[in-house]
Amino acid sequence: EKMAILKNRLKALPEVEEATYGNANPISSWGNGVHDDNEKLIGMLRMFLADSTAMKMLGIRVIEQYCEPAYGKIWVTEDAKRAYGISAHKPWFGMRMQDGKHEYEVCGVIADYHSGDALSENEKTEHNAIGVITPQQGGWVVLVKTRGDHAQALQAIRNTCKQVAKELIGVPAEMEAEYLDDTLKNNLKDKHNMMVLI
């Protein structure tokens, strides 16, 4: 798999402390609906997919664990736990599906965290969650934790991505690589510039 080659090559860099799969991140999460048994939308989950390594890299703390994390299950925040009445005796929520299972099966509870950019706020019916992926599923994003000089590490990552792209697809394509902190700063700057223009 091409992403595995990229992940392993990045992980081998001296500037990289850890590299693992993720599909999106807390800043660029997406919305998944929560429905009652009549299929009425009752809430929204702001989600991204991550494995346990990515969760540790992002500083996400597990509060309770109900079962082994497996693909198809989710981690919910303390806020979502309260909103949907989740417990060790009721580790599910959402409408009942045709196979008898519920829309969401919960493997555990994580500490509340902020999703979206620095100014984003969840609506009253929006809650955060992380879908479980395992190293076998892979992902479309490689999350990387660096060490040492940030600019030097970023350049090493970009060079490696370009080199791997050339080896795999024949073209030294640029890949998007940015620190989450920089993404947040740029979002704030963009919002500030927009306010100044208005």
Language-model-detected regions and their locations in the chain:
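Structured, solvent-exposed hinge/loop segments at the ends of secondary-structure elements
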Residues: 1-84, 88-90, 99-102
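"Rare, low-scoring activations can occur
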Residues: 2-18, 71, 78-83, 88, ...
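A glycine-biased structural micro-motif
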Residues: 92-94
